[in-house]
Amino acid sequence: MARIRVLDADTVSRIAAGEVVERPAAVVKELVENALDAGARVVHIDIAAGGLERITVTDDGCGMEPGDAELALQRHATSKITAAEDLEAVRTLGFRGEALPSIAAVSRLTLRTRPAASSAGTVLETEGGLVLSAGVSGGPPGTVVTVRDLFFNTPARKKFVRSAAHEGAMISEMVGRLALSRPEVAFRLTVNGRQVLATSGSGDLLDAIGAVFGAAVAREMVPVRFEERGLGVSGYVGRPGVSRSSRRHQVFFVNGRYIRSAYLGAAAEESLHGAMPAGRHAVLVLHLSVEPGMVDVNVHPAKHEVRFSQPRDVYVVVHRAVREALHREIQIPVEECGHLESACFPGAGTGFRIPVQVTFQGGEPELREESTGYQGFPQLQPLGFLPPAYILAGGADGLYILDQHAAHERVLFEQYLRTLEQSAGKQLLVPVMVEIRGREAQTLEDYGPFLRQAGFEVDPFGEGAYLIRTVPSFLRPGAEAVLLTDVLDRLAGERPVDADAFRRVVAAVLACHRAVRGGDKPAGPEAAALLTDLGRCAEPYLCPHGRPTLIRIGFPELARRFQRE
């Protein structure tokens, strides 16, 4: 009996949908890119229940004739290419003819469309990829696609979708990136009936950055414009004062297409070495223009990644573009942090300094002698410092090498965690205003109860603006906005499930801000104190992010290496 069979069309469609439609944000991306390819100048995205219940994308693009509308729901039907040679120079966002039929295969989809030259439009209703009805429809020129009950017929896929709040935040982030790709298009995103993002469509990228990341960030952006080797780089890079704790605010486009690129990110990060505070990452929005034949956009099912024919040239051009732009505007800061109590983050050129020291009411919380420590931690004696970041220590069983930043992070993390568990927040005499938009705004809404338990009270104050009224009792004045935005940035990636996990995120962010940095040489007493405090920690061998704080080279291993056995 034959074991190999040709799959039926329904199964093939669901497999294809699994590659293209990973989550609701992928649906939004594909539908919006179709709208942009259709020449839309206004795009409205409206979602309910994180996109699982409903996604509606409305555009004022060219619309489709009845025959084209029906073909658009068939696999591999596209207006973007006509032959294999066209793949060598793709100039549109979509080109495979997979998105719409893949979405239809795992949802209940309604397509309404009308070309401007036609007095009537077309409406198609589908379920699980099957066309249920086709008819005539009115409405303005353009296209409206409504997707309901996403993954209703693929329960295995639905199990891996996160909460509605999380999926909504992912959509908000994706729409923000799409808006940054086309500042000449007016975008509007509505989530559960509430507008969370709107861009003007003025064509000014800085306006779009202000709408997506906030006006405070836009004011601190430096223009980037550079051409070399047939490549062009344009966009903006943020000054150190608006740096972030993660790379999530670094956005790259190639010929107008949003991509994920560790390669471009590495080029930009390397160019900023010495300009950004240690452990911080610049806000970046960069558009790279290349000849279509120099980039392959057909290497990823969701087109998130591309391949360059001359990757080294791309790296060099991005590196130079960012470095020259920032160096024209600011002077590279020199850190002069001499000991554990002075870890600093200079905010050069902005009049803004990230406040990393924390003042506690009633004094700094200490790891007291009676606190529960790790019972097996060895007694260590500091021997010296190995640049850039390592303390050498001797123990009864060998040589220990301590990563001073990771160790200091662990000590501070446990201090802050106990304080968060034991103390309430303190009310600020003057509330601090902070701009929070997009995914971070959704995260703020989702974690409101946990924030209050950790000592934060944050209230809305107009579109994209919030007032911080209460903060953890130990926080130094001036650090409120930076801490909150970094906490929200971390939460967007980690999504803690309870108040304890939330407090750990807050404590980890604080510890990372405060901990001594590489290159800071500790004095002898400071090194000894750090070793003692680390030994009193409940988990001394790992920093809050899971990296080792120290390693041991035993005496037998040393003897073997020196051939003394």
Swiss-Prot record:
Give one GO biological process term.
mismatch repair
Record InterPro entries: DNA_mismatch_repair_CS, DNA_mismatch_repair_MutL, DNA_mismatch_S5_2-like, HATPase_C_sf, MutL/Mlh/PMS, MutL/Mlh/Pms-like, MutL_C, MutL_C_dimsub
- Molecular functions (GO terms): ATP binding; ATP hydrolysis activity; ATP-dependent DNA damage sensor activity; mismatched DNA binding
Entry GO terms, CC:
mismatch repair complex
Q: Would the keyword DNA repair turn up in this protein's UniProt record?
A: yes
Q: Could you tell me the superkingdom of the organism this chain comes from?
A: Bacteria
PROSITE patterns given for it? DNA_MISMATCH_REPAIR_1
Q: Which UniProt keywords apply?
A: DNA damage, DNA repair
Q: Name one Pfam family in it.
A: DNA_mis_repair
UniProt record similarity statement? Belongs to the DNA mismatch repair MutL/HexB family.
- Its biological purpose: This protein is involved in the repair of mismatches in DNA. It is required for dam-dependent methyl-directed DNA mismatch repair. May act as a 'molecular matchmaker', a protein that promotes the formation of a stable complex between two or more DNA-binding proteins in an ATP-dependent manner without itself being part of a final effector complex.
State what protein this is by name: DNA mismatch repair protein MutL
Origin species, per record, is: Desulforudis audaxviator (strain MP104C)
